[in-house]
Amino acid sequence: MQLPSFYTKTLPLLASALLSLSTFAQTKKAPYDMTIDGVKVIVQPSGNEIVEIKTLIKGGVQNYPADKAGIESLAMNALVECGTSKDSKNSFKDKLDKVSAQLSADAGRDYSSLTMNCIRSDFSTVWPLYVDAITTPLFDEKEFQRIHQDAINILKAQASQPDYSIDKMAHETAFAGRDYAKSPEGTEATVTKLNVAETKAYYHSILTRSRLLIVVVGEIDRSELEQKVGALLAAIPAGAPFTLKRERFDPTHNSFKAEKKDLATNYIQGLTAAPQPGTADFNAFSLAARIFYDRHFLEVRTNNGLSYAPATWFDGGLSSSFNISVSTTDPNKYVAVLKALMEKTKKQGFTAEEVKNMKTTYLTGTYYRQETNGAQASALAANEVLHNNWRRAITLNEDLKKVSVEDVNRVFNKYLAHVTWVYQGDPAKATADLYTQVLPTAEKLPPSKLSTQKN
């Protein structure tokens, strides 16, 4: 298989960048972890003047019932928007602005986090504010009403966005009855019912040392960290032992669910099984998913003109899945093209050249994204929570070297067996049987709609 000119021109540059970034990583002090009051603290010396600290609360959508979806997102936002016992919202933000520091909160399906970012010389000023935000948030009634209404307005706006709507339907259908069916930001119905008292009580119920993980990227002495983190954790109860649940998504048959919507085109999303984080198949499947993205894009858009932005992606969370997404006016032709492509890929496999090139592209992109302290902290945190191995963020280069072409082809065949499809648009244009039947055996792709004549 001959490589496109893009690859022949850029692969040497990518390899050079990867080598430079790897060399830079090796010059920094070695990362380490320690346990303080039962909480793991991961420390990556940064070699620069920026300090990034991320405190994670594990559990995500496992922490609340479906009728309370959105409560954790609202609570985390309140930590940075509703003041503390010592400062009003304005006073709190003014103190951060004076030293150009930032505090930010996030709530996801697997964990939530509160992050601080500042320069090393301001650490002693910002750290007490960070501790107050975690341990004594005010949950001021007036400020809470503001962020509560903001959350509702965002959900209303998202409901009218087809890409958001189809993804929400896909999760609710594929993971029905499971935690991953819940959306971290909730729904308009669930969030509207939430009030300041129950949101505050909920936050304090999940703020336990048994759920925490702390990640530090910066140049801070170990003794100073031990003292400051120890004081922080002394104000937080131990809580009951907590173990993250890992639920495998593995549909046993193809399914198709349609919802009529008045849209300019039709939106389709399918979910298949995928390896869970921390398993032997994960890295190989990550490569397979990325290569298939390129093949899918080429076949669906370039060769058949069926969609402007076809996509596939590997969601490697605690309930992992492989996602296929497209918007098209010809859903029946699309599924025929997709099935033929999947079958051809299963029969003929990915090539050694494709796997080699994707390793380089994947690693280079990963290292570039980890140039900032924030990106490094996020990578360390995700790998610890999902893979139970924070060092994977550092060893990925060596880990991928061990993945063979045979591994990549094996996992693609293993996991892409059955698809849970959802559809929004005109149901009359989609034949459900085409989506639910077993994959065809034909290797020949439907002919391209695009002309191959050169200008």
For the regions a language model picked out, list residue spans one by one.
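Acidic/histidine-enriched segments that form metal/cofactor-coordinating
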Residues: 4, 93-202, 340, 355-374
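M16/insulysin-pitrilysin zinc metalloprotease superfamily fold
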Residues: 81-87, 117-148, 314-369, 442-455
